[in-house]
């Protein structure tokens, strides 16, 4: 270790103390984690840092999903800590979830000491190599003197350009090395570029295409939300009079009560949104990556479009899935701000009338019941009682799609869901992180009975810390989305979908110290939900729903967007 002298403005401290001070310097409000042998110096240093808030989850995957929910709902960088070996590998699914959805995280993992690296030491795992395809960048810290710079760089990389997870792997001996601490305050990264400034020529070409179009449509994706550009999009839409369809992650990026909103498009998109894309002469994708759940059959996507324009912060997305005629690279907020200085109304009067007919002819609908609880009814009820103002997290499955369809999102960062990876077990821990980051907002976690059993242990956190998340479990005693696909695409050959052996969720909640409620018929549904809203602490509400209820509309794999199964007489 280097011999150093300290100046009056410096302190001689350990790598663990350097880490905690660096996190505080970056404005970190809370860290989610789980201790183990190779991070014990870090956890020991926390004892002497009363300002450092740490929440002990019950599984490392719960920690990273909570950090993810915190990041998505606040726009800040989420942070989690785990030990080496199984602690680090338990984070892999959460890292991939964040990477697919461009979520800024800094993940701190311990590792074995440098003198035994490569010897298959106890709890040794090469987490850098394991996670290389699913991180924006990774660091192995071999010298404590590099740690202040690495922490500062990690936060900068995670939260600039196309955002994403950055991993810092710290061997145990490095966490106990000492150095004269000086906080890093500059970033020098050769070859790394954040977001380029908008190119006026690119934007002018897009505005000219808008002037020539008669049936334009905007596809607004998660990039609109992550760029904090909702207001710029609203202004652009109201000026140009171009209708908007949103992706799953784009929900809330444009208000659902705006007359120019068509709804969600894609695999379970609404009729008007899907038909708008299939009949448009100009597609303008803003912060959407044209993934397969949006385009469906690729060679049948937007067949009448004369031009496809793509606005994105990441040049690698341009032309990756869909041939792009016009590209605008840059931070979406800045791109739209520039566009708004020159935008004019498009000639969309007749087009908007046609789209309104689509909305009237084929609105979202379902067959309600006077007795059983339909899941769509539950989501409508939650939407109405919260007036679209809550932060909603979902797990993955049918309930995720019902939420996307029937909850009316008015604001960005109000829907927290795993889009690209489709991670079961994500929704409830993400709700904990969202509530920690937004203590004054109502947070509702929508789960299926399958996904809830992948993360139920995190109810302990809600009870201990009194984190008042409203936990909703839609219990149909089956893996519903798998069942629906087996019904429609595998000739009803149902295989390994029965969840009838699940626990009593109310008793499970009570065992963790959380209030539990259940509704088994429609008369009980609104009563228990209102009771849940009036409960000051965390509460779980189980709604027993039919096993055979499916999500519609649905576009089958290998078919174009306009070939929807509507689920009712067409």
Show the residue positions of the predicted features.
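Glycine- and charged-residue-rich phosphate/anionic-cofactor binding loop of Rossmann-like
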Residues: 139-142, 369, 517
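Active-site diphosphate/adenylate-binding microenvironment
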Residues: 16-20, 24, 28-29, 42-46, ...
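N-terminal alpha/beta PP-like core and its mobile active-site loop of ThDP/TPP-dependent enzymes
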Residues: 2-344, 381, 385-388, 461, ...
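Glycine-rich phosphate/pyrophosphate-binding beta-alpha loops
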Residues: 36-39, 85, 102, 292, ...
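Generic enzyme active-site microenvironment
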Residues: 167, 310, 393, 446-447
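Phosphate/pyrophosphate-binding active-site segments
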Residues: 2-10, 145, 305, 309-398, ...
């Amino acid at each position: 270790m280097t011999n150093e002298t300290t100046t009056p403005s410096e302190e001689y401290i350990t790598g663990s103390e350097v880490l905690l001070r660096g996190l505080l310097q970056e404005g970190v409000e809370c860290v989610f984690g789980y201790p183990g042998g190779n991070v014990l110096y870090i956890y020991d240093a926390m004892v002497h840092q009363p300002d450092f808030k740490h929440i002990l989850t019950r599984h490392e995957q719960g920690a990273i999903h909570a950090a993810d929910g915190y990041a998505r709902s606040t726009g800040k960088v989420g942070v989690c800590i785990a030990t080496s070996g199984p602690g680090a590998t338990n984070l892999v699914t959460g890292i991939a979830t964040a990477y697919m959805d461009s979520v800024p995280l800094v993940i701190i993992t311990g590792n074995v000491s440098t003198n035994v690296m490569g010897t298959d030491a106890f709890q040794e795992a090469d987490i850098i190599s394991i996670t290389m395809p699913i991180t924006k960048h990774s660091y192995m810290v071999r010298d404590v003197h590099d740690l202040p710079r690495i922490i500062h760089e990690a936060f900068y990389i995670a939260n600039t350009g196309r955002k994403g997870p950055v991993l810092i792997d710290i061997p145990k001996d490095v966490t106990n090395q000492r150095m004269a601490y000086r906080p890093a305050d500059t970033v020098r990264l050769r070859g790394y570029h954040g977001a380029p400034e908008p190119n006026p020529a690119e934007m002018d070409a897009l505005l000219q295409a808008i002037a020539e179009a008669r049936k334009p449509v905007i596809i607004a994706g998660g990039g609109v939300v992550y760029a904090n550009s909702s207001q710029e999009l609203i202004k652009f839409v109201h000026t140009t009079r171009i209708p908007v369809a949103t992706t799953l992650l784009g929900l809330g990026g444009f208000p659902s009560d705006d007359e120019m909103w068509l709804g969600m498009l894609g695999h379970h998109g609404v009729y008007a949104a899907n038909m708008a894309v299939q009949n448009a002469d100009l597609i303008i994708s803003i912060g959407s990556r044209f993934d397969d759940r949006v385009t469906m059959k690729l060679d049948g996507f937007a067949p009448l479009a004369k031009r496809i324009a793509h606005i994105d912060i990441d040049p690698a997305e341009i032309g990756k899935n869909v041939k792009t005629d016009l590209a605008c690279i840059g931070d979406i907020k800045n791109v739209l701000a520039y566009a708004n200085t020159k935008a004019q109304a498009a000639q969309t009067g007749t087009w908007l009338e046609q789209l309104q007919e689509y909305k009237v002819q084929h609105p979202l609908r379902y067959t309600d019941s006077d007795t059983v609880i339909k899941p769509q009814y539950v989501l409508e009820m939650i939407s109405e009682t919260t007036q679209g103002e809550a932060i909603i997290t979902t797990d993955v499955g049918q309930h995720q799609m019902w939420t996307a369809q029937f909850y009316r999102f008015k604001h960005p960062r109000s829907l927290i869901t795993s889009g690209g990876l489709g991670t079961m077990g994500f929704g409830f821990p993400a709700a904990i992180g969202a509530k920690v980051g937004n203590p004054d907002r109502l947070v509702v976690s929508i789960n299926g009975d399958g996904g809830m059993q992948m993360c139920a242990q995190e109810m302990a956190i809600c009870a201990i810390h009194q984190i008042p998340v409203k936990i909703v479990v839609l219990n149909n005693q089956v893996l519903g989305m798998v069942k629906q696909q087996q019904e429609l695409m595998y000739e009803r050959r149902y295989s390994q979908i029965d969840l009838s052996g699940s626990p009593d969720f109310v008793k499970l909640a009570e065992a963790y110290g959380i209030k539990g409620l259940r509704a088994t018929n429609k008369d009980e549904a609104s009563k228990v939900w209102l009771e849940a809203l009036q409960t000051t602490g965390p509460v779980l509400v189980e709604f027993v729903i039919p096993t055979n209820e499916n999500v519609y509309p649905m576009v089958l794999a290998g078919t174009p967007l306009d070939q929807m199964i509507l689920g009712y007489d067409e």
